[in-house]
Amino acid sequence: MKLSLSPPPYADAPVVVLISGLGGSGSYWLPQLAVLEQEYQVVCYDQRGTGNNPDTLAEDYSIAQMAAELHQALVAAGIEHYAVVGHALGALVGMQLALDYPASVTVLVSVNGWLRINAHTRRCFQVRERLLYSGGAQAWVEAQPLFLYPADWMAARAPRLEAEDALALAHFQGKNNLLRRLNALKRADFSHHADRIRCPVQIICASDDLLVPSACSSELHAAL
């Protein structure tokens, strides 16, 4: 699996791995790179089955597989210890990494993560799946910002959102891969073993997030 590694800003700089959500694209983190690269060697990547890591995913594809293939790619790149920042699905992959490779993960930052999918989040994805089946990739992509951003924020950034829509559509991962990654997200359940995570964990959430209620982060905090 291909990784994008920034040059270390100094000798033995710590490594931070950025894991995006269901879209799978490493470009999700572009706004943060300039700041992070001043202090860290930053690893971004397109998740398997997306972007520059194309593949056909198995029907039983899982969060554990996502974590394993990322860890193997990091080891192959000579990276033994790393911090993880994960958003949504990426936070789930980060928790799996912390559980399966505790000697490697130094710290975990969970952004809008959860223990297991909330009923509200499941409902949102059901609506989006119907859009995918009825309107195809374009309907899925165009609806995505409505589940992510406040209306005022979107209204003030219409050209940016149109450009992001065009990019997402051009690099759409395909319906089958998307649904298999989504099913992996739905099946994930850390409610019985999150307390086994031993590295420091920082939890970040948005109080006005439409897709993931902030209560999910509170539940995660309590479980840790």
Curated annotation (Swiss-Prot):
In what residue span(s) does the AB hydrolase-1 domain sit?
A: 14-115
Any one GO MF term held by the record is: hydrolase activity, acting on carbon-nitrogen (but not peptide) bonds, in linear amides
Q: Which GO terms describe its biological process?
A: acylglycerol catabolic process; nitrogen utilization; uracil catabolic process
Q: What keywords does the record list, in alphabetical order? A: Hydrolase
A Pfam match: Abhydrolase_1
Q: Which GO terms describe its cellular component?
A: membrane
Residue ranges of the TM segments: none
Q: What is its EC number?
A: 3.5.1.-
Organism domain of life: Bacteria
Query: What's its catalytic activity?
Result: carbamate + 2 H(+) = NH4(+) + CO2
**Family, per the entry?**
Belongs to the AB hydrolase superfamily. Hydrolase RutD family.
The protein's matches in HAMAP family, at most eight in alphabetical order, are given as: RutD
Function of the molecule: Involved in pyrimidine catabolism. May facilitate the hydrolysis of carbamate, a reaction that can also occur spontaneously.
Q: What protein name applies here?
A: Putative carbamate hydrolase RutD
What species is given as this protein's source?
Shigella dysenteriae serotype 1 (strain Sd197)
